[in-house]
Design a protein with these regions (language model features):
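Arginine residue identity/basic-tract feature
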Residues: 39-42, 60, 93, 103
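Minor-groove-contacting beta-hairpin "wing" of winged helix-turn-helix DNA-binding domains
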Residues: 58-64
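Major-groove DNA-recognition helix of helix-turn-helix-type DNA-binding domains
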Residues: 36-58, 81
Length: 113
């Protein structure tokens, strides 16, 4: 059976950068989504591995990219990496992901014109 081709509309839905960038989730939900305990998320926040959206607020809320960082760091820890090594590897990958987000966003802006 031949796999179904993904049409342009499906790709736009999957790559809705504007939506992904606007997603902001409280620490409890991040813990529920990722399976990583809040205490561990707070520790990673204190170490600078992830950053809340508003550093001045007493409420810890995170955007999509930071939620993704939590998932990736935990996966690397599960594979046996140290926290520092996992954070370094994720930050390198995060830089690449951020560049892709910028390019996709720029392409979407260009298409609107």
């Amino acid at each position: 059976m031949k796999p179904k081709e993904i049409d342009k509309a499906d790709i736009e839905i999957l790559m809705d950068v504007d939506f992904l960038v606007s997603v902001i989730v409280a620490i409890g939900e991040v813990a529920n989504i990722t399976g990583v305990p809040q205490r561990k998320i707070r520790y990673w926040d204190e170490k600078g591995i992830i950053e809340p959206v508003d550093k001045t607020s007493t409420y810890r809320q995170y955007n999509y990219l930071n939620i993704k960082k939590v998932v990736l760091v935990q996966e690397l820890l599960d594979e046996g990496f140290t926290l520092d090594a996992a954070a370094k590897k994720v930050n390198e990958r995060y830089t690449k992901v951020a560049e892709v987000f910028k390019r996709v966003s720029a392409l979407k802006d260009h298409q609107k014109k």
